[in-house]
Amino acid sequence: MFVQVAVRNEEPAQICDKIAGIVQRAVREALGNDAARNSVHLTLGSDESKGIQPWLADEIRVAILIISGETFGAAKKRKLFGLIAEMSSLELNIAHDQIVTGIIETPRENWSNGYGERQWLQYLSYQLP
């Protein structure tokens, strides 16, 4: 599981770390310890060079993208999204409509795992009938 967090320019720097912690706790609670243990978090923070305007009350403050090699049922995803929104609201005062979370479920063969082409083919050869 790969988690990417991005925030708007005007957010304090520690927001990214706090959001990453919230996502990890929500993943553990909604999807189980294995999913939380096998996750990598990348926090982008804000990018001053892009010139993004300060956030307004009705704009997105935080965007979270979760890419998973596993498939989760609709109920688990709803629980995950709800937990992230609730924890962010309670702990960071981020309104539910100011945080967007997306999950992409893709098979493990779509992940490089740092392998070059030869290593990848060798890895896949063990899975062929």
What are the functions of these language-model segments?
Residues 1-129:
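Interaction-mediating elements
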